Design a protein with these regions (language model features):
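Acidic active-site catalytic centers that drive phospho-/nucleotidyl reactions
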Residues: 14, 84, 92, 110, ...
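Acidic, turn/loop-rich segments in luminal/extracellular domains of secretory-pathway
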Residues: 37-107, 165-184
């Protein structure tokens, strides 16, 4: 957050002088504490610490920015949440106190990872692949849910996409694409 209404100091107070409050240290959950440079803001000499799901950059003025690390959060299904918790030290120049900043990371529907497939057939024969161990989805994955993968389009090199019916199987109502050397 970059405005004074939304930084970590917004709801922190000091009975002596709230104007002199500053963040002096930051610590990710389970990590080491790092000093925050006096007079810094998140975008000018701010201190960067890595949490479980992303990186927080925080300044002494309480401003911060958090950047989620998609690879760390890939295991979250769409709509699932996890939290990154950071403990910051607040100082008025004489005494200190600590508080936490909790960032909620929400999973998104990650794109599946389709792996190229190859096969071979004699010129006068047919090759048929069925079942989970032999079809084109066998080596494809989805961080969210590999069990729900389906083929939705197919095309030959240089051709256009052909939609695949959701009720298609290899022996009924299937979509065929004619290539240079045969029909798929």
């Amino acid at each position: 957050k970059t405005s004074s209404e939304d930084d970590v100091l917004n709801d922190d107070t000091d009975a002596d002088d709230s104007a002199s409050l500053a963040v002096t240290a930051i610590q990710p959950s389970g990590g080491s504490s790092s000093n925050v440079s006096s007079g810094s803001s998140y975008n000018s000499s701010g201190t960067s610490v890595t949490g479980t799901y992303g990186t927080l950059v925080i300044g002494a003025d309480g401003s911060y920015t958090y950047t989620a690390d998609q690879s760390a959060a890939d295991d979250l299904d769409a709509g699932d949440t996890a939290t990154d918790v950071f403990t910051y030290t607040l100082s008025d120049g004489t005494a200190t106190d600590t508080a936490t900043l909790t960032i909620t990371v929400t999973g998104i529907n990650d794109a599946p990872d389709a792996i190229d497939d190859t096969d071979s057939v004699n010129e006068d024969a047919t090759v048929t692949k069925t079942g989970s161990q032999n079809d084109v989805l066998n080596d494809d994955t989805d961080a969210d849910d590999s069990a729900s993968l389906t083929v939705t389009q197919i095309k030959k090199d240089g051709g256009s996409n052909s939609a695949v019916s959701s009720s298609s199987t290899y022996n009924s109502n299937f979509t065929s694409v004619t290539g240079t050397y045969g029909t798929l």
